[in-house]
Amino acid sequence: MGRDTERAISAPAQQTSMKLLIDKAIGLGAADAVPISPGKVVVGNWVRLKCQFGCGGWGRCLTCPPYSLTPEQTSKILSEYKKALLVHSRGSHPSLRKLMSELERFAFLKGYYKAFALSCGPCNLCD
């Protein structure tokens, strides 16, 4: 809590303006949101090690390793998108998960049918 965190929400190339999504993200409580190219996202293999050896939650949540996507799967999925929105928040994981879930739904309803929020940390939305 209190630590800066960043998340990405991917969306397909559509006519809908990314500005609408940026405004919505900020309206939901994000500190900032900027469009990025998914092709510029670097997916490091070392990140999984931080989860495995640095987090007591390893293997306890289906959104975390070893159940989550591998770096290879993540890279492959990102390659299928033309646009992404990097969302910056100073909030905690639970509040940010809710923000991202609402933003993903909003994007989908605006025509970004492949919209999918990606983030780190355990998800407690279904607990």
List the model feature ranges, each with a label:
Residues 2-127:
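Auxiliary alpha/beta "docking" domains used to position bulky ligands
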